[in-house]
Amino acid sequence: MDALVLFLQLLVLLLTLPLHLLALLGCWQPICKTYFPYFMAMLTARSYKKMESKKRELFSQIKDLKGTSGNVALLELGCGTGANFQFYPQGCKVTCVDPNPNFEKFLTKSMAENRHLQYERFIVAYGENMKQLADSSMDVVVCTLVLCSVQSPRKVLQEVQRVLRPGGLLFFWEHVAEPQGSRAFLWQRVLEPTWKHIGDGCHLTRETWKDIERAQFSEVQLEWQPPPFRWLPVGPHIMGKAVK
């Protein structure tokens, strides 16, 4: 099976050789950083229609929280275009973190469309190192379709726990690997080396639920969801919350 995967990976590499050459020369990353926000804006507009009811169900739990300073202090990690803003309850104080500064103009548009929120700031940073944020400064951290593309999910979750107050909540929604041994998992393995370039570091075969369960949260609630688009190689999704 491994030999078949390697053969098919090489075949895909040959078919996408210009992309891999650009990546090897260091030219692809700036291109991807510039145009990936437009791709995400288009994709989230379509996928959120399919996931809207579940998203509302997940984030409706935020309104039951009481922030340490009144309104709920919410950090969105890997905020992207701000597509989640519509689901947050009135008065949330939202801080946004994303390593790609090109998302900021999309965030500005989302902020204008969601006046029910208080916007604190946009921080350009990686989730593995959010030194700009103080310990125990957040009531809620939201992480959707982010842990697939970070360098180290373990370090990101450590940072999440650092910035969350005791009893604070992590809300997550992530795509994960298909069941090992399945045909879908085989194709994820085949496509992953190329997909990482297309998806700005996105990994198709991560078992992110294991990272969350190992992260020493006091409680984890997790639910599986089918992928919104069968024509994409992303696998099933997990949604839920974890308590510090």
Curated annotation (Swiss-Prot):
SUPFAM superfamilies: S-adenosyl-L-methionine-dependent methyltransferases. The keyword Membrane applies. One of its GO terms (biological process) is methylation. It is found in: Endoplasmic reticulum membrane; Lipid droplet; Microsome; Cytoplasm, Cytosol. It is a peripheral membrane protein. One of its GO terms (molecular function) is S-adenosylmethionine-dependent methyltransferase activity. This is Thiol S-methyltransferase TMT1B.
